Regions:
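Positively charged, small/polar-rich N-terminal and surface patches that mediate targeting and assembly
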Residues: 1-106
């Protein structure tokens, strides 16, 4: 199993989630987060000294999926969230060693 983690622009969250739902993704978790990376960070921090309210808001999506679905999910997220401009976000994939449903554990 894999964990797909995506940080995307909040403006594209509805389109990404809709496309994942249409593709049969059965569940995901979404978080409102703040942060930044890349070349903008140096300029940004020189003007705004590390105050959380000054960081741009993004959406963090997490999808646990079968290994064979990973590439499809990554591509769906990338297509729906891509503008071609800096700040579109990132997608990371991690291995998931074990998944258990809490209600089904003894």
């Amino acid at each position: 199993m894999k964990l797909v983690i995506a940080y995307i622009r909040t403006d594209y969250a509805a389109a990404v989630i809709h496309d994942l739902y249409k593709a049969g993704v059965g569940g995901l978790t979404a978080y409102a987060v703040r942060g930044m990376s890349g070349k903008k960070a140096t300029f940004f921090y020189s003007k705004h000294p590390f105050e959380i309210d000054h960081l741009p808001e993004s959406l963090k999506l997490e999808v646990v999926c079968a290994e064979e679905s990973t590439d499809k999910i990554v591509e769906l997220i990338a297509q729906a969230a891509r503008t071609g401009a800096a700040g579109d976000g990132i997608i990371a994939v991690q291995d998931v060693e074990r998944v258990m449903k809490i209600r089904e554990t003894a």
